[in-house]
Amino acid sequence: MPSPPAMLLGGLLLIVASTTVAQRRGQEAAGRRRAHRVQHGQCSYTFVLPEPEPCPPEPEAFGGSNSLQRDSPAATLNLGDWPSQRMRQLEKMLENNTQWLQKLERYIQVNLRLELAQAQQHMVQNQTATMLELGTSLLTQTTAQTRKLTDVEAQVLNQTSRMEIQLLETSLSTNKLEKQLLLQGHELHRLQGHNSALETRVQALETQQQAELASLSGEKERLRRLLGRQSGALAGLERTLRAASSNSSLLQRQQHQLLESVQRLVRVMAQGPASMRAADQLFQDCAEIQRFGANASGIYTIHVANVTEPRKVFCDMEASGGGWTLIQRRENGSVNFQRNWKDYKQGFGNPAGEHWLGNEVVHQLTSRATYSLRVELQDWEGNEAYAQYEHFQLGSEAQLYRLSLSGYSGSAGRQSSLVLQGTNFSTRDADNDNCLCKCAQMLSGGWWFDACGLSNLNGIYYPARHHVRKLNGIRWHYFQGPSYSLRTTRMMVRPSGI
């Protein structure tokens, strides 16, 4: 709705416009105008005041339009005063208009000043409220940010504390491992010294044994000569006794004594050391050595048919009746079992420690007679188990040393961890298994893998505390599971029926 000053200004403009319309012709003739300008802030108001058109004298003043008048000096004088009177009237009207405009300007200025002050006050109040709202918002945001920073600081402190604790634990673990490593180093040096002492003792025992063998050989030769002399003496005595037997009881008693002496001598010769008698014999396996009288477990030499050179083997004369020929042993990881086909064919390692006798030797042994196989196992907790097969045979190299087993028994599982029939031997350079994945390369070692199978006693040797979850370790599935690497293993054979 328009304000009162605006309405008053509009009314004044309407009056001025009406006057202007009535007197437009006079204005155009005169060509003179008056303007009044009002300035208010950035806005200005300009009022144009036209000059009023002079009114001509009425016709009656000159005596009528249709009558002839005489020239009169008085009439002429009145007509000459009319413009000046009209000018005074217009000036007075202009002065009045000017006064009205000034009053209007003052009224507008006063009212506009009040409205401007009110608007400014309202604006200040709005700005103050806005600033208060902004301040409150900023304070709220600052509080929230401070809270977040406090939370982040607490999290950083917690994380720092955890990291310090982890660092301390890591440091303690490192110190513990260093101490364990130092202790293991000392233990290793001690074992090396002990091993050197044992080697020296073994060498001394070998030297002593060789000396005893030489002494026994000399004793044997001396006994042979003595036996020859005794035989000659007995022959002479027999002749003498025949001559005097009819009438000499004394000679009969002497003859009886001599016969007893000879019998004792023969028994002494028959009870000589088994090792001295075994030196002149050739044995094909440890069972023959045991039958000949040797009952001590150790290293012996055997001569296997169709094998050109004699082989040193370890004979177990105690387990399950003895007479076992070892074909494999794992105990400390000192021998690398990551070998090729040729190595597994010929054999490798030391018979007194870790070794593989050789597929060709085992094939020749098991092809001339029926053999049994015994597998002995021990885990890292000291538990022992065995698996025994009454019939064991290994095919030739042309047959890829194919495994044939039957008659399973033992404590190493409810069933065999070896495939009983038709499994070929595989190595890293000879993939003969029934899997596309090349089990020998994936699981390591040489073995009868089949389709990677349930066992592999020639896998990687893992020490204590590193022996679990090892698929490529020394495994026997039905004893300790598919990924438990065992501590020791032995495989040995002997003729069936013993």
UniProtKB/Swiss-Prot annotation:
Gene3D superfamilies: Gamma Fibrinogen, chain A, domain 1. Keywords: Angiogenesis, Coiled coil, Disulfide bond, Glycoprotein, Secreted, Signal. Residues 85-109, 186-254 form a coiled coil. The keyword Signal applies. Residues 277-497 form the Fibrinogen C-terminal domain. GO terms for molecular function: receptor tyrosine kinase binding. GO terms for cellular component: collagen-containing extracellular matrix; extracellular space. This is Angiopoietin-4. It comes from Bos taurus (Bovine).
